[in-house]
Amino acid sequence: MNFPDSSLFTPNFAYENDLDFSSLITPSTRVSFQEPKPCNPVIHSAGIENDGRQNCETTMTLSEIMKGDDEPKNKRAKHKELERQRRQENTSLFKILRYLLPSQYIKGKRSSADHVLEAVNYIKDLQKKIKEVSEKRDRIKRSITHPSSRGEFSIRSLASSTCSCVGDTNIAVVVRPCLIGLEIVVSCCNRHESCLSSVLQLLAQEQCFNIVSCISTRLHQGFIHTIASEVEEGIEVYFSELQEKIIKIGTSRVTTR
């Protein structure tokens, strides 16, 4: 079988050069993919106008987003910490308050509100006691600085009854109540110089007297001793019996010389 000559199928390159195939070639669209870095991921958002053109591109890092979310959490954490510290301080202060209050004020009361109320009552009671003690102190000062006419009369009568005789051993004693408890006035001659110490020893032995003041006055014929003493609560003092004891001990001291 005879084939035609291959030269018959040779393309005419000169004619081919006149043809334009560029319109038949469709350019390939390449989409570039860039994997974001894990350490700093990026979120892209594009705003599109009405004409379809891209308006702007906003870039926000994930760390900024997380920071904005953490701000309320940080505020809540700070608030909780401050509240915890405040509660601890209040608890410690209430413990100190319970320690300072006497037991009779907080007996049977456990709530903090009751403790605060009893603390107010305790302060009022202390103020009342301070006022009473101050008034009592002022009365004692006035009685010592400005003695009453009755006291002056008693002292004068005792002084007049004091003998000037060398051999006389009598002692005049007056026991009477006063503002603070008991007042003892002893008048004696010059021979009874140790009378005051004897009376003080006697009062100390009784164990129910608390001596507050002692004033000794020297006269021409002897001495006048004025003793102010407190008496313990619940103890009854018999003035006549105490007067006899003082006279007896004063007389015995002079006799034994």
From Swiss-Prot:
It holds the Pfam family HLH. It comes from the Eukaryota. It comes from Arabidopsis thaliana. It is found in: Nucleus. Keywords: DNA-binding, Nucleus, Transcription, Transcription regulation. The keyword Transcription applies. Induction: By salicylic acid (SA). Transmembrane segments: none annotated. One of its GO terms (cellular component) is nucleus. One of its GO terms (molecular function) is protein dimerization activity. Residues 74-126 form the bHLH domain. This is Transcription factor bHLH55. Homodimer. InterPro entries: bHLH_dom, HLH_DNA-bd_sf, MASH1/Ascl1a-like. GO terms for biological process: regulation of transcription by RNA polymerase II. Expressed in roots, leaves, stems, and flowers.
